Amino acid sequence: MSRARQELLSRTALGVFRLNGQFLAVAEELARPAGLTAARWQVLGAVLAEPLPVAGIARAMGITRQSVQRIADLLVERGLAEYRPNPAHRRAKLLAPTEAGRAAVARIGPRHAAFADRLADSFGEAELASAVELLERLAVVLDKLDPAVTEP
């Protein structure tokens, strides 16, 4: 790897780490009035369209199954989600939001929309769309690099 490419990789990773921290801070602020955390909002959001097994949520979110399991159990304990039987797998139950869970996510909607407008107005809607496309493409490429780290 050339020094220039190594620098590009470092700058990209550090930039994404910084963005991750910034987006998590925003998500915490948006979720708090609804009685959620960013992580709980993220897991609930993953199952709004359809119930999913914990492993499926983890794959979609790019985090460990154990982390999702812990959050899912908390959501169920608080009445925001429930486990349902999974016809495809007897032991891997499906996580689904309850009406209370859907209501909590819905309470985030107006503040989320207002922040989305502020961000698009400040950054530029076309620029934001381009950034999203680029980040999605980068994620696909990284997924295909198997293993992610190789010997020189």
Short names for language-model regions:
Residues 1-34, 126, 152:
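N-terminal leader segment of winged-helix/HTH proteins
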Residues 1-4, 126-152:
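C-terminal regulatory/oligomerization modules of transcriptional regulators
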Residues 11, 15, 22, 26, ...:
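Pre-recognition alpha-helix immediately N-terminal to the DNA-recognition helix
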Residues 19, 23-26, 30, 61, ...:
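Alpha-helical linker/hinge and terminal dimerization helices associated
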Residues 24, 73-133:
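Charged, amphipathic alpha-helical coiled-coil/dimerization segments
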Residues 25-67, 150-152:
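N-terminal helix-turn-helix DNA-binding core of bacterial DNA-binding proteins
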Residues 44, 57, 72-78:
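Basic amphipathic alpha-helical segments that dock to polyanions
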Residues 45-49, 109, 136:
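Short, locally clustered residues in the helix-turn-helix/winged-helix DNA-binding domain
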